[in-house]
Amino acid sequence: MPDQPLAVELRARRSEMMLETLEAVALRLFEQRGFSAVTVDEIAMEAHTSTRTFYRYFPAKDDVLQVMIERRSEALRVELAASPDDEPPLASLKRALGSVLSAEDPGAVRRWISVIQATPSVLRSVVGGITLKSQPVMGEFFGSRLGLPGDALVPTMLAAAAGGVIMTAHTQWFLLGGDLADTVTSSLEVLERGFGTHTGVWTEVAEGPA
């Protein structure tokens, strides 16, 4: 059936569009009325779909806040995989994040942060999502440059340090404005100065003290 690949592609695109619609509607309602005050039924109604469809995409209401983390993590993985082998690791991370963040809608990111800031009950799950999804992507990349498994101590530490800088930069951007990609990449320069940009420095980090 020659039309089957096209049909599969169309179904995948429709599914992606529904996910994006549900996420956008939910974030708007969460910001306007508060996370706890919004029901799944209301999100589905605003998105012109059914509650059953909502649960097909999200096991629970707070899983809507994980979509951005998952989307970013996959985009970051792709960008880092395309990094030149001779590019310093933190330079690669800055470039990759700059590309990923520049492609996002700043308004949607601001709504996402606004909801999280206003809802302490979801903060733990969001931080957990970042720890479980985004940081391992960075850890695998750092590990590949250091000749270590991604879950080894040094790559994990570096990923956690970078993750902390990135989250802090998001908060600063939310409070002070400006360009998110520029704020994040500028903040990562603190780590870059601390760990150096040359491969030799990273080799010493991986090998530990003599």
Regions found by a protein language model. Give the residues of each.
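Hydrophobic alpha-helical connector segments
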Residues: 74-114, 118
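Short hydrophobic/aromatic patch on the recognition helix
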Residues: 49-58
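Append "Primarily bacterial transcriptional regulators
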Residues: 42-45, 54, 93
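N-terminal intrinsically disordered/low-complexity leader segments
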Residues: 1-17, 192-210
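Basic, helix-initiating cap at the start of DNA-binding domains
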Residues: 1-33, 37-49, 66
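Hydrophobic alpha-helical segments that form the core
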Residues: 151-172, 182-194
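Amphipathic alpha-helical packing segments from all-alpha helical-bundle domains
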Residues: 121-147, 152-160, 168
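Short amphipathic alpha-helical segment with a characteristic S/N-K-E followed by hydrophobic residues
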Residues: 37, 60-65, 75-76
